[in-house]
Amino acid sequence: MSTKFALVTGCGQGGIGEALITEYARRGIHAIATVLPAEPSDHLARAGITFFPLDVTNEESVLELKARVQKLTGGRLDVLVNCAGIAYTMTAIDTDVAAVQRMFNVNVFGPMRMVHHFHDMIIKATGAIVNIGSIGGVVPYLYGSSYNATKAALQHWSNTLRVEMAPFDVRVITVISGEVATNILKNDAHRRLPEGSYYSPLAENFRQHVTRTPPRTTDRFQYAANVVAESLRSSPSAWFWYGSQSTLIRFLDMFCWRTVWDSLFWRMFDLGKLKEAHSSKAKKQV
């Protein structure tokens, strides 16, 4: 039986990628992880997992990885998992567009670049492409408009990619991830609303939001076990929903009116307090 190979991007310590690559290795698949060039990789070395440096926003970096993977696998790749991603938390009206461009470069153009350069290896193996999406790409979760936009873009691109790759017997799975216990928000913990923001009455709410530990999350290794199992099926789900809150959100998205989220998030994010503060300020200015 020939060796199977799985390549997972974004395998830094504490994230979904690390959990996914660990699960592929546990199943006897030759797991190939990537980490940022300056990112620690001791956790992968200790686990005996093959790893290479990769910056998905850099064309030369992707081409260097391709050459290494081709040499290792003989030009075939059974599974490509596009997991590398970053977050940016801010209100839509206070968004730093340059920061959002960086996020799109990683979350959207990164997977596009990987598929562009690795598709021939995947076709030769009649393999699978797994794109890690999010419930944020489905619902208007507050303070996440830009991140949500990257995931919505990824998910729609992945949806079309699935149809386009079908003639080559390549399976494309879009994973709609619920809340999973990872450290993706660690770089946002310092973020605060800009001075003078219309959202300033909720400044403390925002601070608590970016420093929060979500109360109900799915263990990342449990998540990985289910996602990997799905990716290895001969007929996987087109959209695979998994993780905390994903079942509820899937139901509401399918069967409820489009604005069902408005009232839910109005209460969850205390928007009534913001409306009162804005109305009071407007009256004083009259």
UniProtKB/Swiss-Prot annotation:
EC number(s) given by UniProt: 1.1.1.-
Record: residues binding NADP(+): V8, T34, D55, Y147, K151, V180, T182
Keywords: NADP, Oxidoreductase
Catalytic residue list: Y147 (proton acceptor), K151 (lowers pka of active site tyr)
Pfam family name, one: adh_short
Keyword Nuclease: no
Positions in coiled-coil regions: none
InterPro entries xref list: NAD(P)-bd_dom_sf, Sc_DH/Rdtase_CS, SDR_fam
KW Transcription (keyword) present: no
Pathway assigned in UniProt: Secondary metabolite biosynthesis
GO biological process: phosphatidic acid biosynthetic process; secondary metabolite biosynthetic process; triglyceride catabolic process
Disulfide bonds: none
Similarity field: Belongs to the short-chain dehydrogenases/reductases (SDR) family.
Function comment: The PKS fogA releases the carboxylic acid (8E,10E,12E)-3,5,7-trihydroxytetradeca-8,10,12-trienoic acid as its product, as well as derivatives with one and two double bonds.
Name the record gives this protein: Short-chain dehydrogenase fogD
Organism of this sequence: Aspergillus ruber (strain CBS 135680)
